[in-house]
Swiss-Prot record:
<feature type="compositionally biased region" description="Pro residues">
    <location>
        <begin position="1035"/>
        <end position="1044"/>
    </location>
</feature>
<dbReference type="GO" id="GO:0071880">
    <property type="term" value="P:adenylate cyclase-activating adrenergic receptor signaling pathway"/>
</dbReference>
<feature type="modified residue" description="Phosphoserine">
    <location>
        <position position="1173"/>
    </location>
</feature>
<feature type="region of interest" description="Disordered">
    <location>
        <begin position="68"/>
        <end position="101"/>
    </location>
</feature>
<dbReference type="Pfam" id="PF00595">
    <property type="entry name" value="PDZ"/>
</dbReference>
<feature type="modified residue" description="Phosphoserine">
    <location>
        <position position="1117"/>
    </location>
</feature>
<dbReference type="InterPro" id="IPR036964">
    <property type="entry name" value="RASGEF_cat_dom_sf"/>
</dbReference>
<feature type="modified residue" description="Phosphoserine">
    <location>
        <position position="1113"/>
    </location>
</feature>
<feature type="region of interest" description="Disordered">
    <location>
        <begin position="1090"/>
        <end position="1176"/>
    </location>
</feature>
<dbReference type="InterPro" id="IPR001478">
    <property type="entry name" value="PDZ"/>
</dbReference>
<feature type="modified residue" description="Phosphoserine">
    <location>
        <position position="501"/>
    </location>
</feature>
<dbReference type="GO" id="GO:0043547">
    <property type="term" value="P:positive regulation of GTPase activity"/>
</dbReference>
<keyword id="KW-0472">Membrane</keyword>
<dbReference type="GO" id="GO:0005096">
    <property type="term" value="F:GTPase activator activity"/>
</dbReference>
<feature type="compositionally biased region" description="Polar residues">
    <location>
        <begin position="1304"/>
        <end position="1328"/>
    </location>
</feature>
<dbReference type="GO" id="GO:0016324">
    <property type="term" value="C:apical plasma membrane"/>
</dbReference>
<keyword id="KW-0217">Developmental protein</keyword>
Length: 1486
C-alpha cells in the first residue's frame, strides 16, 4: 500500500478497476441498472477480499413496516377455511414476533478490547472480518493475523472533523471500517476514501508527511490503526516467513510459515503460490499440520489452471509405480472419486483411468483399498435413465443379468453386447437396474425381472453403477459353485435395520451399498453385514487416512477453517457421529461435504396411506410403505373389505378423470410400487374383480373428483406449502456439484454446463413472481388480503424449515412494486401480520454485509439441512474471485483457490444430512409458539432431534398410534400442494403485473384539493404507490418547461442524519492523528476509549445507539464512493421528492424494476409542528414545479440523498443512478428504531451493505443541517411562488433566486473529464458540502438556538461552486439524483406503509444508459395523456436571470451542541416562533 503522502495512489483507491463482472452473473433478476460498482464486504462471514469491480446489483433495504391505527379487520365476508381460521391464528401464537432478531456485535467487542487482552478466538473473529477488506488484499493470512493482533479501534463521531492536516507527520497505517473521509489537496483536487480503504505510512520507518487535509464526511467514522513501528515490523517480517522453492534458477513454489495459535503447537509451512506442475507434485508430498486440505482444495480447483484432468491422472498412475508414493496416490484417487465423481462419469478418458487404477490395485493385492474405491464409486454414482427399444417381444435382450432377491441382491448387468444399442445408451457391466417402466427392480426375483424385460418392446430403464455390490455378488456365485450350496448373504435387510436412526459409520456404508433383503425375515442378518464392513474399513483406514493432527476441530468441519487463519468453526455441526478411529478432521470417504447416502432406499415401515374404493363407492384406508406393491395392496384391501375371494381374482385399478371430463381406467401391474406417490388428485384406486366388467366410477363421482382437483392457494395448508417448497429447493440445492460453483465462477466450459446451479438460481425468481402473480390475479380485495396473510405464514414456516431462499423470495414478492402499491389491501392486513412481516424482513437487513442473516446462519443451533440465500453465496464467491488475482508473479495464486474451496465446502455442509429428504422438513401441526425466536434454530425439527442425540433413537411404528384417515388427509394435502406447485402459471413480466395491479386498485389523483383532504395520493404513472403518511396541503407553483437537452438534470437534495451522536468528548477538541499533535497516536486511542466508555453509558441515553452498536449491525453501514473512471449517464426525467408532515423516508426499489421507479423524498422525523418546506414534483418532460407544503420543523433536516442517507437505499451507481425512495409513517413506538439510524443502515444499496461496498455511491450521511442543507434553511421573504430548481447529475447548475421574484437562471456546468482525479466518476465523490461552504452572504436565514440570523436579502442568490473552483476550505457539494422514468411520484396513505423488498445481490437490471438520450428506453413508458395534459397546465412563466451572486465560504455553525436534544427526538419550532409566523415563511430551495 502506498501512503497518503504520495498523491498518485492512496491505498487501495489508487488501483484502477481491472474487470467488471460479466453480466450473466446477475441473471437472477432485473433491476433498474447495471452497476459496475465495487462493493466491499464487511460482515464477519463472507471471507472475501476485493480489489476489483463486482457487478452484483443494488438492493433496496427491507425496512420496517409500521402499524396503522386500524386494527384487525372484519373478515366475515370471506368464508373461512379450515386452513386459515381465526381459531388457528389464536392457536398459532404469533406473539413471538416481538422477539428481536439481534445478537451482539462480536467484531466490535473484539475491536474494543485492548490488543494485549485479545484471545486467539478474538483474533480469528477479527481476521475473518478484516480479510475481506480491500486494504488487506493480497496480504498473506499470517500478515493479516499479526495486524489484527495489534490494531486499535477509533471512532470519529462528527462529520467535518479534521483527521489529518496538510504537512502533518504520519505515525500509523489506518483502515476505514465505517463511513468515509475526504482528502482535499492543495491544488484543489479531492479524493474520497471509503470503507475498506487504507491511508497512512508505508512499511518503512522513514518519516512521511500528510499531503492534503483529511476530513470525515459522515458521522461515526470508524478506523483501525496500526502504529508505524508495528506495521513496518509485520510487513517486513513477511519475507522472513517465506520459503521459496527454486528449480533451475526459477521460483516454482512459494510457501509461508504460519502459526495458527500462540501455543506454538500448530505451525508449519503452507503453499501460497506455485506453478501448475509443482502444485500437482505437491499432492504426494508431505503436508504440514497447517495445510491438511491441500489435496481437497487442489482436486476442486485444478480445473482453473489445468486444461485436462488427465494431466493429473497420468502423473498419479506414474507415481503409483513408486512403492513409497503408492499409499499417497491411492488416497488422492479415493478423495477424488469421493468428492468429485462427476469428473469421471461421462468422461471416457477418466473412466479408463479409473479402470486402470483398479487393475493396479488388484495387481498390487491392495484389496482393502480397492473395496474402498468401489464403495466410493457406488456411493457417488448417480442414477441414469436410458431408453431401449426391441423390434419384437421375442427379440433377445442385448445384455445378461445376475442377482435377484432370491440371492439377496438386486438385478445387475453381467455383460452387454458390444455392438448393441444398450452399449450406445451407456449400459455397462456392473450397473444395477433400479427400475424398468416404473416397476421397482431393487427387490425382485431374477425370473420375474427377465419376464418384464422380455414382455415389453419399449424399455425405460433406470440404472446406477454399483461395482462394490456387483463384485460381492460375483464372489458369492463363485463360492456357491465351489461349495455347492446357496450362500445366504451376510449383509441383509438394511432398510429395516437403520432407517429411523442415525447410523454409525459402518451402517452409512451399508446404506450406500444398497444391498437387498433375502426375505421378510432376514432382519437379524444386518449385524453380520455391519461387522464385515467395519472390518473392511478397519483394514484400510489406517493406511489411507492420515491420523488426526489435533483434537479441537468439530466433526462438521474440515481443518481448513483453522488452517487458513479463519475461524475454527462455521457452526454447522454435522449430524454424523464418526467412529473414534476415523480422523474427524479430514473430509475423507464417508464425510464428504455433500451427501454420501443414497436415499432411494426408504423404510419398510408403513408410513403412507392409500384410500381404496370398491365399485359400490365404499372405501378403506390401507397403510403401506413406499415399496409396497400393487399385489400386496390387493391382499390388504381384500382383508379390509372382508371379501372372501382369493387375491388372484382381484386387481388394483386406477381411475382418473381428465380436465375435459373423460374417465380413464387402467389396471396396475402387480409389481408397481410407490403407489401413494403415483395417484393424481383427480384419480382413485379401485379394487376390481377381474371376472366382472362393472363401472367403477360413475359420472357424478367423476365430476366430484374433478371438483376436488381444482385447487386454490387459500385451500392449502401453509405448513405443507412451506414443507414442499423446502423439499423441492433442498433437492435442487444438494444436487449442485461443488465443481459447478467453480465452473460458473471462472466461466469454464463443462459437460454439465452448471445445469443444477442454474436451476437452483432460477428458483428465487420463480417464487418471487409466483407471490406477485397469485396476489394480483385475485380480484376480491378481502381474498387478496388473505393471500398476503397466507404468504406471510408460508414465509414463517420456511424460516422454520431453514429455507432462507424461499423465505427471501416470498418477502421479495410481497414487496414487488405492483404488490406494494395495493394500499387498501395492505390496510386490511391484521396488525399482528404487519409485525410478523416486519420481523421476517428484518432478518435480511442488508447492513454490515447482511450481518443478521449471517449470524443466524452460523448460529450454533442451526444444523443441516439448510437452504441458504443463494444470491449471498454467489456474491461471496464472486468477491473472492474478483478481489484476488488468479496469478501472482506468474505463479498460480493457490491462497485464493484455497479460500474459494473453503467457501464452497462451507456451503456444501449445509446440504450434508444423513436423512431421507422426505422426512427432513416435516413439522406437521407445529404451533408457532414452539417455533422459537427467528434467530434460533428449530431444535424440535425431526432431523435435529435425531442429529442431536448422536445415537439411535427408539423406533416407533407410526401406524400404532397415528390414525390412518388423518395420515391420508395429510398426504392428500401434500398431493394438493405438489399439484398446485407443478401447475403454477407465473406472470414474469412486470409490465403485465403493473397492469393487473392497476386493475385491482386504480391509481388516484396526485394532488389533494385542500389541507384537510386526507385522500391518499398515488401517481398514475408510478408503478409504486407507497403507503406513507398523511398528505399535507400542496400548492402548485408554476415552473417553466425545461429544454430537452436538460433532461439529464438531477435534484439537489440535502442530507441530515437522525442518528444520535455518541457525544462524550467533542471530537474537535481532540488533536489530529499525526505526530504534530501533543498526544500523537494517543488521539486515536482516546477516540477509541471515548467510544468504549460511550457504549457503557449509552443504554440510558438512547435506544437506537444501543441497538445499533451492541447488536448485529454496526453503528454505521459501510458507505463508499465509486472508483475513478465512471461518470453518470444522463437520465430521462427528473424525479420529484416531497416531504410529509410526519413521514419517514424509505427508498422503494423493487427487485425487478424496469417499471418501478420511485422518487427521492426528504426524510423528516415524526412530529406535528410544521413549517413550510419544498417539494418538487416531476412532470412528464422534466418540467417540475415547486410545491409549498407544511413540513416538519426539525432541528435537523434529513434528506433523501441517495446512498448517504442510511434509509435512502435505492442507490444505483455508475451506469445509471436511480433512487427510488418514498415515505412511510413512523408510529410513536418505532421512532426510536427509525431506519435513518445509521446503526442498521448503510442501506444505500443492497450491495453496498451486503457486500460492504467501498465503491457505493455515498456522500453525506448524518450531517448536521448546516453542512448539508442548502434549502430547507435558506429562506427569502417572497410571498409568491418559489421557483423550481435542478442540478446536473455531475455538477451543480447555477441557480439564483432574487428577492421578490420567482425568476431564476440556470447555467449547466460542463462535466469534468474522466481522467481528472477529483472527478471520481460520480456525483458522490466530485463534491464537497454545498450547504456549508456556499452559505456566505446569500440572504439565507440561519437559525442558531432558535434565533433567526438574517443576512442581506439582496444578495440572496446561491451560486454553485464547480469542482474546478473548489478549494480545500470551500469544496462544492451536492447530491445529484439521476431519476428514472417519469414514474416515481411519491404517494401517501393513512396508516401503515409496506416497505419494498431487498433486491438480492447479484441481480442485474436493464441499464437505462444503454440507449441514447434521443430514444426512449424500451422498458419505459410515458405517462397517461390526461396526466401529461394536467401537468402541462402547471408550466411556469418565463423568468429573467438575475445577476449572479458570489458564493463565499461561510463558517460552519455547530448545530448540535452537547446541550442540544437528540436529533431523533423530533423537530421543534424554535422558541418564539409561532405557528402563524411559521406558515408565513417562504422557503427557497437551492
Amino acid at each position: 500500500m502506498k501512503p497518503l503522502a504520495i498523491p498518485a495512489n492512496h491505498g487501495v483507491m489508487g488501483q484502477q478497476e481491472k474487470h467488471s463482472l460479466p453480466a450473466d452473473f446477475t441473471k437472477l433478476h432485473l433491476t433498474d441498472s447495471l452497476h459496475p460498482q465495487v462493493t466491499h464486504v464487511s460482515s464477519s462471514h463472507s471471507g472475501c477480499s476485493i480489489t476489483s469491480d463486482s457487478g452484483s446489483s443494488s438492493l433496496s433495504d427491507i425496512y420496517q413496516a409500521t402499524e396503522s391505527e386500524a386494527g384487525d379487520m372484519d373478515l366475515s365476508g370471506l368464508p373461512e377455511t379450515a386452513v386459515d381460521s381465526e381459531d388457528d391464528d389464536d392457536e398459532e401464537d404469533i406473539e413471538r414476533a416481538s422477539d428481536p432478531l439481534m445478537s451482539r456485535d462480536i467484531v466490535r467487542d473484539c475491536l474494543e478490547k485492548d490488543p494485549i487482552d485479545r484471545t486467539d478466538d478474538d483474533i480469528e473473529q477479527l481476521l475473518e472480518f478484516m480479510h475481506q477488506l480491500p486494504a488487506f488484499a493480497n496480504m498473506t493470512m499470517s500478515v493479516r493475523r499479526e495486524l489484527c493482533a495489534v490494531m486499535v479501534f477509533a471512532v470519529v463521531e462528527r462529520a467535518g472533523t479534521i483527521v489529518l492536516n496538510d504537512g502533518e507527520e504520519l505515525d500509523s497505517w489506518s483502515v476505514i471500517l465505517n463511513g468515509s473521509v475526504e482528502v482535499t489537496y492543495p491544488d484543489g483536487k479531492a479524493e474520497i476514501l471509503c470503507m475498506g480503504n487504507s491511508f497512512g505510512v508505508s512499511p518503512t520507518m522513514d518519516k512521511e508527511y500528510m499531503k492534503g487535509v483529511m476530513r470525515t464526511k459522515v458521522d461515526d467514522c470508524q478506523f483501525v490503526c496500526i502504529a508505524q513501528q508495528d506495521y513496518c515490523r509485520i510487513l517486513n517480517q513477511v519475507e522472513k516467513n517465506m520459503q521459496k522453492v527454486e528449480e533451475e534458477g526459477e521460483i516454482v513454489m512459494v510457501k509461508e510459515h504460519r502459526e495458527l495459535d500462540r501455543t506454538g503447537t500448530r505451525k508449519g509451512h503452507i503453499v501460497i503460490k506455485g506453478t501448475s506442475e509443482r502444485l500437482t507434485m505437491h499432492l504426494v508430498e508431505e503436508h504440514s499440520v497447517v495445510d491438511p486440505t491441500f489435496i481437497e482444495d487442489f482436486l476442486l480447483t485444478y480445473r482453473t489452471f489445468l486444461c485436462s484432468p488427465m494431466e493429473v491422472g497420468k502423473k498419479l498412475l506414474e507415481w503409483f509405480n513408486d512403492p513409497s508414493l503408492r499409499d499417497k496416490v491411492t488416497r488422492v484417487v479415493l478423495l477424488w472419486v469421493n468428492n468429485h465423481f462427476n469428473d469421471f462419469e461421462g468422461d471416457p478418458a477418466m473412466t479408463r483411468f479409473l479402470e486402470e487404477f483398479e487393475n493396479n490395485l488388484e495387481r498390487e493385492k491392495m484389496g482393502g483399498h480397492l473395496r474402498l474405491l468401489n464403495i466410493a464409486c457406488a456411493a457417488k454414482a448417480k442414477r441414469r435413465l436410458m431408453t431401449l427399444t426391441k423390434p419384437a417381444r421375442e427379440a433377445p435382450l442385448p445384455f445378461i443379468l445376475l442377482g435377484g432377491s432370491e440371492k439377496g441382491f438386486g438385478i445387475f448387468v453381467d455383460s452387454v453386447d458390444s455392438a448393441s444399442k444398450a452399449t450406445e445408451a451407456g449400459l455397462k457391466r456392473g450397473d444395477q437396474i433400479l427400475e424398468v417402466n416404473g416397476q421397482n427392480f431393487e427387490n425382485i426375483q431374477l425370473s420375474k425381472a427377465m419376464e418384464i424385460l422380455r414382455n415389453n418392446t419399449h424399455l425405460s430403464i433406470t440404472v446406477k453403477t454399483n461395482l462394490f455390490v456387483f463384485k460381492e455378488l460375483l464372489t458369492r456365485l463363485s463360492e456357491e459353485k465351489r461349495n455347492g450350496a446357496p450362500h445366504l448373504p451376510k449383509i441383509g435387510d438394511i432398510k429395516k435395520a437403520s432407517r429411523y436412526s442415525i447410523p454409525d459409520l459402518a451402517v452409512d456404508v451399508e446404506q450406500v451399498i444398497g444391498l437387498e433383503k433375502v426375505n421378510k425375515k432376514s432382519k437379524a442378518n444386518t449385524v453380520g453385514g455391519r461387522n464385515k464392513l467395519k472390518k473392511i474399513l478397519d483394514k484400510t483406514r489406517i493406511s489411507i487416512l492420515p491420523q488426526k493432527p489435533y483434537n479441537d476441530i468439530g466433526i462438521g468441519q474440515s481443518q481448513d477453517d483453522s488452517i487458513v487463519g479463519l475461524r475454527q468453526t462455521k457452526h454447522i455441526p454435522t449430524a454424523l457421529p464418526v467412529s473414534g478411529t476415523l480422523s474427524s478432521s479430514n473430509p475423507d470417504l464417508l464425510q464428504s461435504h455433500h451427501r454420501i447416502l443414497d436415499f432411494s432406499a426408504t423404510p419398510d415401515l408403513p408410513d403412507q396411506v392409500l384410500r381404496v374404493f370398491k365399485a359400490d363407492q365404499q372405501s378403506r384406508y390401507i397403510m403401506i410403505s413406499k415399496d409396497t406393491t400393487a399385489k400386496e395392496v390387493v391382499v390388504q384391501a381384500i382383508r379390509e373389505f372382508a371379501v372372501t375371494a382369493t387375491p388372484d381374482q382381484y386387481s388394483l385399478c386406477e381411475v382418473s378423470v381428465t380436465p375435459e371430463g373423460v374417465i380413464k381406467q387402467r389396471r396396475l401391474p402387480d409389481q408397481l410400487s410407490k403407489l401413494a406417490d403415483r395417484i393424481q388428485l383427480s384419480g382413485r384406486y379401485y379394487l376390481k374383480n377381474n371376472m366382472e366388467t362393472e363401472t367403477l366410477c360413475s359420472d357424478e363421482d367423476a365430476q366430484e373428483l374433478l371438483r376436488e382437483s381444482q385447487i386454490s392457494l387459500l385451500q392449502l395448508s401453509t405448513v405443507e406449502v412451506a414443507t414442499q417448497l423446502s423439499m423441492r429447493n433442498f433437492e435442487l440445492f444438494r444436487n449442485i456439484e461443488p465443481t459447478e460453483y467453480i465452473d460458473d465462477l471462472f466461466k469454464l466450459k463443462s459437460k454439465t454446463s452448471c445445469a443444477n446451479l442454474k436451476t437452483f438460481e432460477e428458483v428465487i425468481n420463480q417464487e418471487t413472481f409466483w407471490v406477485a402473480s397469485e396476489i394480483l390475479r385475485e380480484t376480491n380485495q378481502l381474498k387478496r388480503m388473505k393471500i398476503i396473510k397466507h404468504f406471510i405464514k408460508i414465509a414463517l414456516h420456511c424460516r422454520e424449515c431453514k429455507n432462507f431462499n424461499s423465505m427471501f423470495a416470498i418477502i421479495s414478492g410481497l414487496n414487488l412494486a405492483p404488490v406494494a402499491r395495493l394500499r387498501t389491501t395492505w390496510e386490511k392486513l391484521p396488525n399482528k401480520y404487519e409485525k410478523l412481516f416486519q420481523d421476517l424482513q428484518d432478518l435480511f437487513d442488508p447492513s454490515r454485509n447482511m450481518a443478521k442473516y449471517r449470524n443466524v446462519l452460523n448460529s450454533q443451533n442451526l444444523q443441516p439441512p439448510i437452504i441458504p440465500l443463494f444470491p449471498v453465496i454467489k456474491k461471496d464467491l464472486t468477491f473472492l474471485h474478483e478481489g484476488n488475482d488468479s496469478k501472482v508473479d506468474g505463479l498460480v495464486n493457490f491462497e485464493k483457490l484455497r479460500m474459494i474451496a473453503k467457501e464452497i465446502r462451507h456451503v456444501g455442509r449445509m446440504a450434508s444430512v444423513n436423512m431421507d429428504p422426505a422426512l427432513m422438513f416435516r413439522t406437521r401441526k407445529k404451533k408457532w409458539r414452539s417455533l422459537g425466536s427467528l434467530s434460533q434454530g428449530s431444535t424440535n425439527a425431526t432431523v435435529l432431534d435425531v442429529a442431536q442425540t448422536g445415537g439411535h433413537k427408539k423406533r416407533v411404528r407410526r401406524s400404532s398410534f397415528l390414525n390412518a384417515k388423518k395420515l391420508y388427509e395429510d398426504a392428500q394435502m401434500a398431493r394438493k400442494v405438489k399439484q398446485y406447485l407443478s401447475n403454477l402459471e407465473l406472470e414474469m413480466d412486470e409490465e403485465s403485473l403493473q397492469t393487473l395491479s392497476l386493475q385491482c386498485e386504480p391509481a388516484t389523483n396526485t394532488l389533494p384539493k385542500n389541507p384537510t383532504d386526507k385522500k391518499p395520493v398515488k401517481s398514475e404513472t408510478s408503478p409504486v404507490a407507497p403507503r406513507a403518511g398523511l398528505q399535507p396541503k400542496a400548492q402548485p407553483q408554476p415552473q417553466p418547461p425545461q429544454p430537452p437537452h436538460k433532461l439529464n438534470q438531477g435534484l439537489q437534495v440535502p442530507a441530515v442524519s437522525l442518528y444520535p451522536s455518541r457525544k462524550k468528548v467533542p471530537v474537535k477538541d481532540l488533536p489530529p492523528f499525526g505526530i504534530n499533535s501533543p498526544q500523537a497516536l494517543k488521539k486515536i486511542l482516546s477516540l477509541s476509549e471515548e467510544g468504549s466508555l460511550e457504549r457503557h453509558r449509552r443504554p440510558a441515553e438512547d435506544t437506537i445507539s444501543n441497538t445499533s452498536s451492541q447488536l448485529s449491525s454496526p453503528p454505521t453501514s459501510p458507505q463508499s464512493s465509486p472508483r475513478k473512471g465512471y461518470t453518470l449517464a444522463p437520465s430521462g426525467t427528473v424525479d420529484n421528492f416531497s416531504d410529509s408532515g410526519h413521514s419517514e423516508i424509505s427508498s422503494r426499489s423493487s427487485i425487478v424494476s424496469n417499471s418501478s421507479f420511485d422518487s427521492l423524498p426528504v426524510s423528516l422525523p415524526d412530529e406535528r409542528r410544521q413549517r413550510p418546506s419544498v417539494s418538487i414534483v416531476e412532470t412528464s418532460l422534466a418540467s417540475g414545479r415547486l410545491e409549498r407544503r407544511p413540513a416538519v420543523e426539525p432541528d435537523q433536516y434529513s434528506l433523501g440523498s441517495c446512498a448517504p442517507l442510511s434509509e435512502s437505499r435505492g442507490l444505483y451507481a455508475a451506469a445509471t443512478v436511480i433512487s427510488s425512495p418514498s415515505t412511510e409513517e413512523l408510529s410513536q413506538d418505532q421512532g426510536d428504531r427509525a431506519s435513518l439510524d445509521a446503526a442498521d443502515s448503510g442501506r444505500g444499496s443492497w450491495t453496498s451493505c451486503s457486500s460492504g461496498s467501498h465503491d457505493n455511491i455515498q456522500t453525506i450521511q448524518h450531517q448536521r443541517s448546516w453542512e448539508t442543507l442548502p434549502f430547507g434553511h435558506t429562506h427569502f421573504d417572497y410571498p409568491g411562488d418559489a421557483a423550481g430548481l435542478w442540478a446536473s447529475s455531475s455538477h451543480m447548475d447555477q441557480i439564483m433566486f432574487p428577492d421578490h421574484s420567482a425568476k431564476y437562471s440556470r447555467q449547466s456546468q460542463s462535466r469534468e473529464s474522466l481522467d481528472q482525479a477529483q472527478s471520481r466518476a460520480s456525483w458522490a465523490s466530485s463534491t464537497g458540502y454545498w450547504g456549508e461552504d456556499s452559505e456566505g452572504d446569500t440572504g439565507t436565514i440561519k437559525r442558531r438556538g432558535g434565533k433567526d440570523v438574517s443576512l442581506d436579502a439582496d444578495s440572496s442568490s446561491m451560486t454553485a461552486v464547480t469542482a474546478e473552483e473548489a478549494k480545500p476550505a470551500a469544496m462544492a457539494a451536492h447530491i445529484a439524483v439521476t431519476p428514472s422514468a417519469a414514474k416515481g411520484l411519491i404517494a401517501r396513505k393513512e396508516g401503515r406503509y409496506r416497505e419494498p423488498p431487498p433486491t438480492p445481490p447479484g441481480y442485474v437490471g436493464i441499464p437505462i444508459t444503454d440507449f441514447p438520450e434521443a430514444h426512449p428506453h424500451p422498458a419505459r413508458k410515458p405517462p397517461d395523456y390526461t396526466v401529461a395534459l394536467q401537468r402541462s397546465r402547471m408550466l411556469a412563466r418565463p423568468a429573467e436571470p438575475p445577476a449572479p451572486g458570489s458564493a463565499r465560504p461561510a463558517p460552519r455553525p455547530q448545530w448540535h451542541r452537547p446541550g442540544d436534544g437528540d436529533p431523533r427526538a423530533g423537530p421543534c419550532a424554535p422558541p418564539g416562533l409561532t405557528a402563524e409566523e411559521d406558515e408565513d415563511e417562504q422557503v427557497s430551495a437551492v
